[in-house]
Amino acid sequence: MYKHLLIATDGSELAGKAVATGLQLAKALGAKVTAVTVTEAWAAMVPGEGAFVFPVEEYERAAAQNAARVLADVAAQAQKLGVACETVHVTEFPAEGIILTAKDKGCDLIVMASHGRRGISRVLLGSQAVRVLTHSTVPVLICR
């Protein structure tokens, strides 16, 4: 069946449910896991009223710290379950980063949440989940 699962997480509560589901599935299948969190590239200007310049170094440092925290949590959960887990932080548009990581790591299933940090603003699926489902050649398990 599946031998190598990619579990995508942004650290949100719903993504945490996808992590738990993916790890339990990996354990049941005897599969290994690659956990990925994707950070969008820095944007110099934050649009909107009262726009301000956000220093790239500060953004990159905060993104790296957040990714390390999120991925360390996944690795700790995997270790408790006895599941082999590699962690990866990618700077890319989220859907593209997930798809590319699955391909690069040879994953045969992507596990991800239906919605991420941007909230449940869409009725069925968030925009990143839709993009992954639309463009991935690897099967995708969406968790709600």
Model regions and ranges:
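Structural beta-alpha unit
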Residues: 76-110
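A short acidic, glycine-rich active-site loop
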Residues: 54-69
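Histidine-centered beta-alpha loop that forms part of the nucleotide-sugar donor binding/catalytic region
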Residues: 10, 92, 114-117
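Small/aliphatic-rich secondary-structure junction motif
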Residues: 3-54, 77, 81-86
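Gly/Ser-rich helix-loop-strand patches that form or flank binding pockets
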Residues: 24, 100-144
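Conserved functional loop/turn residues at catalytic and ligand-binding sites
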Residues: 1, 37, 82, 93, ...
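Short, well-ordered secondary-structure micro-motifs
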Residues: 18, 45-48, 98-100, 122-124
